[in-house]
């Protein structure tokens, strides 16, 4: 993998590293972030374990809350350090929509004067992008609201154009995903964020 990263850099191609954290590899995160800096990698993507598809076999290996918070704090600290040193890198997390709220808590602890601005930015971002900014077209042409909704098809690009499928809010699921704000129920609906 490192050889490929170096070859891409030689050709001027922007490169990223992706890390899906489990109990077995969480301890490697600091070294990977160090490697990112040493090798001049442009983007780091921390993926929380998602139980869809292949991820389901690793369910028992998912990290505990304490480890997740440690990893997020390390990622935020690293990102802040890079910013302070003028290093322009991208840090992204995925598969846990609570990351934005945890970032807000981190900002409140470390830079309370920035908390209102951060909350406004997170509200502007809007949270989960399923059905809005993320789509999945599978190998058969079926369009899904995102990469984890394989069980739900909105249509097929062999029968209708993607824009027609994507803009069609007669489908109740798409109408709900495109609503702003979204009507969310259950535990997530009770959250203040």
Question: What are the roles of these predicted feature ranges?
Answer:
Residues 117, 122, 148-193:
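Membrane-interface junctions of multi-pass transporters
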């Amino acid at each position: 993998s490192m050889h490929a990263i170096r070859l891409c850099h030689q050709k001027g191609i922007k490169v990223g590293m992706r890390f899906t954290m489990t109990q077995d590899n969480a301890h490697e995160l600091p070294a990977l972030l160090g490697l990112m800096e040493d090798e001049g990698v442009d983007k780091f993507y921390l993926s929380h374990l998602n139980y869809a598809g292949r991820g389901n076999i690793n369910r028992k290996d998912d990290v505990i809350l304490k480890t997740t918070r440690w990893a997020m704090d390390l990622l935020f600290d690293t990102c802040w350090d890079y910013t302070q040193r003028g290093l322009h890198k991208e840090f992204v997390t995925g598969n846990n929509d609570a990351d934005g709220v945890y970032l807000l808590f981190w900002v409140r602890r470390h830079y309370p004067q920035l908390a209102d601005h951060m909350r406004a930015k997170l509200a502007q971002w809007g949270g989960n992008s399923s059905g809005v900014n993320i789509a999945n077209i599978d190998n058969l042409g079926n369009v899904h609201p995102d990469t984890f909704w394989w069980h739900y098809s909105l249509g097929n690009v062999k029968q209708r154009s993607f824009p027609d499928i994507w803009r069609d809010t007669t489908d109740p699921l798409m109408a709900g995903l495109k609503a702003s704000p979204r009507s969310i129920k259950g535990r997530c609906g009770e959250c203040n964020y």
